[in-house]
Structures are given as structure tokens and as C-alpha cells.
């Protein structure tokens, strides 16, 4: 898969993250079939065209850490009701997007191929 196609798939998945939920760079990379490319997911989101209107603020690292240089991310998440632990990380057990119901209908991935969820 070339970079352009990878970016398109990142954008497609990111668009589907529901209000009040977060998802991780690593899980997006796994869904695309390149689990080792979580950093490339972050790169794709940093280059996302404004017209895509992606909810990039809903993508966090696997521990729930936010982008250090993006102060508005926490504000946007708080407006959606996202809660944080004392260490400043998103409460992942409460807000991580459970995509099992969305896989086939929205993203087009078979639930059997996503056993890691």
C-alpha cells in the first residue's frame, strides 16, 4: 500500500470515531493492516487536509496521552465529556471506542479479522 492510500484509510477510520470516544494510533494502524505504522498514522493526521474536517483530537496514544504540543486537544475532548485520570491521560477504560459494532457497516472490516479488539 502506498502512502496516499494509507493516509486515505487513516482518514476514513478517523472520521468514524464517535463523539465522546477516543481511538489510538496503534489501533488505526492495526485496522489498516500495518500495526507497526502507528507513528505514520500520527503523521497522516498532521497532514490531514482541513476540508476533511477530521476529529483528529479523538486520536491518542495507547496510554491515553495527548499530543504534547497541541493544547486545544484536551479542551476539545473535555467538551465531549471525555474524562482524564490524575496523570493527565484519557480514561481509556471509559472512553476507548468499541468498534466491534462499526467494523462491517461503517469501516468495511470483518469482525473476524479484528480479533485483537
Language model features with spans:
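Nucleic acid-binding interface residues in structured DNA/RNA-binding domains
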Residues: 1-117
Amino acid at each position: 500500500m502506498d502512502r496516499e492510500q494509507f493516509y486515505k484509510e487513516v482518514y476514513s477510520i478517523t472520521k468514524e470515531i464517535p463523539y465522546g470516544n477516543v481511538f489510538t494510533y496503534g489501533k488505526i494502524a492495526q485496522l489498516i493492516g500495518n500495526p507497526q505504522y502507528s507513528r505514520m498514522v500520527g503523521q497522516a493526521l498532521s497532514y490531514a487536509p482541513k476540508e476533511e474536517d477530521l476529529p483528529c483530537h479523538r486520536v491518542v496514544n495507547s496510554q491515553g496521552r495527548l499530543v504534547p504540543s497541541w493544547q486545544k486537544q484536551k479542551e476539545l475532548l473535555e467538551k465531549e465529556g471525555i474524562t482524564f485520570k490524575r496523570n493527565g491521560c484519557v480514561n481509556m477504560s471509559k472512553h476507548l471506542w468499541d468498534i466491534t459494532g462499526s467494523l462491517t457497516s461503517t469501516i468495511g472490516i470483518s469482525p473476524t479479522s479484528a480479533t485483537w479488539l
